[in-house]
Amino acid sequence: MMFEYPFMRWNYCPISISLVAALAINAMPSRAATFGTVVPIAGSASDIALDQSRGLLYIANFTANRIDVMSTADYSIRSSMNVAPQPAALAISFDSQFLLIAHYGNFTAPQTSQNLVTLINLNNNTRQTFATGDPPLGVAFTADGEALIVTTTGLVLFDPISGAMQVLATFANLGQSLPTALATFPSQVISAALSTSGDGSTVYGIANSASAQAFYRYRANGHQLYAIGIVAVPTPLPRVGVAADGSWCMIGQYRLDPSAIDLAQFPNSVTSTTIGGVAVDSKAGIIYAQILTASPQTTTSAIPSTTPAATATPATPPVLSILDADNLTVRDTLSLPENIVGRSVLTAAGDVLYAITESGVTVLPVGKLNQYHRLAASSSDVLALGSFCNRAVITQNLTIADPGGGHTDFQIASNATGVTISPPSGITPATVQVSVDPNAFQNQNGTVAVPLTITSSTAVNLPPAVRLLVNTRNPNQRGTLMDVPGNLVDILADAARSRFYILQQDRNQVLVFDGTTYQQITALRTSTTPTQMAMTFDQKYLLIGHDNSQVAYVYDLDSFQQQTSITFPPGHYPRSLAASGNALLALSRNVATGGPGMIDRVDFVSRTATALPSLGIFVNSVNPAGVLTPSPNGASILVAMPDGNVMLYDASADTFTISRKDLTSLQGPYAASSYNSYLIGNNWLNAALVPVGTLETASGTPSGFAFVDQAGFRTTAPASTSPGVIERVNQNTSVNPTTMAEAPLLPTTTMPFVRTLAPLANQSAVISLTVSGFTVLPWNYDAAVAPPQIASVVNAADGTKPVAPGGLISVYGQQMSPVNIATQEVPLPTALGESCLTVNGIAVPMLFVSSQQINGQLPTNVNGNATMTLRTPGGISDNFYFSILSAAPSIFRTGTAGPETGLATVFRDDNGELITPTNPIHPNDIITIYATGMGATSPPVDSGMPAPANPLPNTVIAPDVTLGGVPLNILYAGLVPGEVGVYQVNASVPSGVPEGMDIPLVVAQAGSSTALSVRVVK
């Protein structure tokens, strides 16, 4: 049989470890239940082959020298086939006729090396053995009936009908000798894997040794072989999964195209030759994977120039990640009973996954996940908004459900003081109340992120923690909070379309927002771990760079359609991009030589990038954590690096004209203007990149900066839990520093440079990435607002000065509220229209606010000499001092009778009408008086709460009511049920009261009294 091999191609394709650390809030909780059934075998499984036509799974028992045969119906080991020593790899032909077994007998003297393959005809159980010369590492059939054999020194094509073998390629010896050390898995000895696409057209494979690695792709049609040398950091896990049509594959933690371009890689992965596995269901767009990851990076402020090939210990518990096939976004995470240590095989329907695990084989019915207990929360975030004045408990609802509709137990907990959850456990579906006591966060005026962990004794998945965001702000803190879950790392305004874009790194997508409504329009998918966005100079396309992909994504901004990606040189990860008037550049993390980063130039027409041979007169060697940003006029591109280096690309000269290092380190915001000014961190740079000014540092760590003409906006914060500060700045001064509702996002260890500020082109608002998501600040956020002033405090019934606890009051002054707002909300709010009052530090429930008057209720627990303070967006008023009596009765003057208004609220029970000269009091009448300021009640009623009807809250101090000096019999004195701060006195009129037009009706209590004149007739 003759074979033609049209070409052999060797590429150098480095792949690197991800450098993105996981958020602490997403830490996995401890597990109880696991997913999958373990089928132990007496020996060590080295490979499996699925025979669906017979309902069997063949298991290569490497140490027991046999093939164990498992029923896929009941998972029992039905039989075993004794074979030659060390069965290492298996493959079954597409017609299910042949089972091919590779025997790895690479023993050293004095033992005999037996390197061969066994071919079993499954239709008639006949066997043949064929010597391979060199030890075989793996085997795979293609749809044409032939098999590919990889040995320690090359690739061989095998015809099972004739037994002919043809060497396709040779490479450096990848073999390991036997015997091996104790406690060694077969995958550590063989360290190779290959797999065929579902259509049988393509085989992908990898083989490793301590010093070499081979990656190859074989196309059965035309017998085309592509051999590609990989230098990978970390070394790819020797597991292979292939798309059904052979158009891409997973080699361990790496998703590769046919040319070995790294399209996506699992973040933060580390070297492992033993633990882990992958399986591809390309029809469903899913990858199943166990990939070991490193601990979050916390000790450095910048990405190192050389990435270590870290090695992790086995994860506890072992987990199976369900990933989106295009960009490896995690859909769900399942607890495994034990680690995967070899091949994983999916059924043709994709409903069952068989994997080699530590005890033998584990069966994972992935198509029946809805029949297993799982948990999911209805929201990633719970937002609790309070204020300095609103100290009432804030309650939000969160639904816990089983995605399959089942009834699953759950526990939800928080370790934060002031946070309670009710119920803390239960059975799904369930709605829990998350209650936050703002008093526990009274020292914070920003946003505190509190993880709510969800666990279960029966759920097989590990739901991520829910982020509880507690914001307690003062009225003078500016901005409207918009909750956006996830790890947000970049923002970019689109002037041409009145939009802005936010990069959501953990979900691998760009969120598109309307610049007028601030509502999300759509989401654009990216590759893995997106780091920065850029627009082409013509503003037509959006570009996205990544830390875990060797391509940059491209989107048409008018249609939102994804375009052909930009492919970068092998080993280059485009973390930052920028477009000038004549060049599109990228700063790439370069692992081709294990060295620093490089600047690449992009040919946008061909969608390819090429490393610049030099940066003008300077060597092309930059810090991989650096960033690029263009001037809006396209004249230049600024390069900023955390080690203090700065560079400038001049578009007119088409070269790098400046390279300086005046500072030892840099981090924070970065920006370039159209007026030859630049900003990095706190440093203002001139056209020569010479520092000519330093911005103030007292307000905290710099976060965002954006030039507007020759000045700019800037945000800072001392900590993520503090309120942020936004200010207008120029080279030498900061103007009008204004407190924000919460902190802007601050630099991190893996993202030393941040872009968090986006002024909208129509100058309507400034958008800042902040702790909760983003904050909308009006363009005139710092417009002058006069501070509030308090002039007087009176009771709200008749406008006199005596006031008492629990009574309704009117506060008069100036600049008391920017708006007029009345509320019927119950309980009464303690913040209304961005204004709030406190008395002795206790918030006042409010009914109405305006520029010159506020109506509210004095707190029930204040007395004596008091201090009132008003907070508004204009600031905090001077202290106003007044006295609070234990009782200060005052009758309302809000009655209306015909054309008469402002009447005292005293009613005759006989007809239910107001007492007037035409509806006078008669002896033996029962009258009802409505008043305020009558003090404490029994039982007590909380401030701002309506009075109950049962039991009735009676006044603690009984009032005296006289009519013309004659005492009236008090039937009831207390709060009106359903009302706040309104008291009712029911009294009977004796027969001996005097008659007249102006008989004094007096209500006296605790030395204070109120009086009015009424008409009394017989």
Please annotate each region the language model reported.
Residues 779-1018:
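A sequence-level detector for low-complexity, Ser/Thr- and acidic-rich stretches
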Residues 44-49, 86-92, 134-144, 173-198, ...:
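Repeated scaffold domains used in trafficking and secretory/extracellular systems
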Residues 367-478:
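Feature for long, exposed domains in two main contexts
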Residues 64-66, 105-110, 154-156, 208-212, ...:
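Short glycine/acidic-enriched loop and turn motifs that connect beta-strands
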Residues 339-372, 748-784:
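Blade-level signature of beta-propeller repeat domains, shared across WD40, Kelch, NHL, RCC1
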Residues 33-40, 76-81, 125-131, 164-185, ...:
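A short beta-strand motif characteristic of beta-propeller blades
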Residues 71-75, 121-125, 159-163, 219-223, ...:
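Short loop/turn segments that connect beta-strands within beta-propeller blades
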Residues 57, 99, 147-148, 203, ...:
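Hydrophobic beta-strand positions that form the internal "hydrophobic ladder"
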